[in-house]
């Protein structure tokens, strides 16, 4: 379960190859469940994108 404050690494973002490998912290989860954070301007869509949690 995703939570604000967790750190993730994007493995694959549908249609956005430049986002692969980016890391960041989840700062907001919207009503649709999309993850917003410090990795850039686009939201991660859990149903379409691949990512992993980074343990600190």
Give names to the regions the model predicted.
Residues 3-56:
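Basic/aromatic-rich interaction segments and small domains that mediate binding to polyanionic partners
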């Amino acid at each position: 379960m995703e939570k604000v404050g967790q750190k993730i690494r994007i493995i694959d973002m549908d249609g956005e190859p430049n986002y692969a490998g980016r890391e960041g912290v989840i700062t907001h989860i919207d009503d649709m469940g999309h993850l917003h954070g410090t990795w850039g301007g686009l939201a991660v869509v859990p149903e379409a994108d691949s990512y992993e949690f980074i343990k600190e």
